[in-house]
Design a protein with these regions (language model features):
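C-terminal substrate-binding subdomain of Rossmann-fold SDR/epimerase-dehydratase oxidoreductases
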Residues: 17, 54, 197-265
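N-terminal Rossmann-like NAD(P)+-binding domain of SDR-like oxidoreductases, especially those catalyzing
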Residues: 1-178, 229, 248
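Heptad-repeat alpha-helical coiled-coil signaling segments
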Residues: 177, 183, 210-213
Length: 265
């Protein structure tokens, strides 16, 4: 039975991946400090999944959790736009120390397979939509704390790529707007649902509402990741998302219709 360490495994995406691979027969260990994750996300599988409370920024915690593992899925991060602005130093601290600790522990323990979670945030405003993996990644304003998360993900990719010679598989995946049950409230879909549910006649939107997003449901995301796990190539980068675009204003209209609200602006 192959063993997999999932950092950030009680987070929304990490928990879904952990449960899916557990059901496939893999032996899963999760390293998380639950600062934003929820242990209840893996409750149904807790007899099969080993949970280690630890801090990704502490090398000793990462090293201990990594022992006897065949793969590392590195997803530990601080996500959510609110935190990018309020705690950019912490966002970068987790990203930078986390990837350094993961790579150093893997090299020392001779773990040869690492899958690194990046983000669609690294593209910022892409030149072409749909966006493929050849699109340049960028930080448009180094002084804007909004890009602390994207900067940390770019560093994660750089660390993985430039240490790839030590591994059989160093694979980077970039999730694009994943949504689903228990994703947390700091994202556009649950935030919009909350606004529509609580408002009587109208809601305020950030910006014009004409911005477009492509969303992927968590179950579809996990299946796509499993395909990358099985067939992905060393040093390849993979977007995980859909090509179906929706304007934010149209997303709001869909949610309004679901709530059956009439005479709504």
């Amino acid at each position: 039975m192959k063993k997999i360490l999932v950092t950030g495994g009680t987070g929304f995406i990490g928990a879904a991946i952990s449960k899916y691979f557990c059901d496939k027969g893999y032996q899963i260990t999760i390293l998380d400090n639950n600062s934003r994750g929820k242990l209840k996300r893996i409750t149904q599988s807790k007899k099969k999944i080993k949970f280690i409370f630890g801090d990704i920024t502490k090398y000793e915690d990462v090293y201990k959790a990594s022992r006897n593992q065949d793969y590392i899925f590195h997803l530990a991060a601080i996500n959510g736009t609110k935190f990018f602005y309020e705690k950019p130093d912490k966002v970068l601290d987790v990203s930078c120390k986390g990837i350094i600790n993961v790579i150093e522990a893997a090299k020392k323990l001779k773990i040869k397979n690492i899958f690194l979670a990046s983000s669609s945030e690294v593209y910022h405003l892409p030149n072409k939509i749909p966006t493929d993996e050849s699109e340049p990644i960028k930080i448009p304003d180094i002084l804007n704390p909004r890009f602390s998360y994207a900067g940390g993900k770019i560093l994660t990719e750089l660390m993985g790529i430039n240490n790839a010679k030590f591994f059989n598989k160093m694979i980077i995946f970039r999730p694009h707007n994943v949504y689903g049950n228990d994703m947390g409230n700091e994202h556009v879909i649950p935030e919009m649902i909350r606004k529509v549910k609580n408002a009587k006649k109208s809601i305020k939107m950030k910006g014009s509402g004409l911005q477009t997003r492509s969303f992927i449901y968590i179950d579809d995301f996990v299946e796509a990741f499993y395909l990358i796990f099985k067939k992905g190539k060393h040093l390849n980068i993979y977007n995980i998302g859909t090509q179906e675009k929706i304007r934010i204003i149209d997303l709001a209209k869909v949610i309004i219709k679901i709530f059956k609200k009439k005479n709504y602006n």
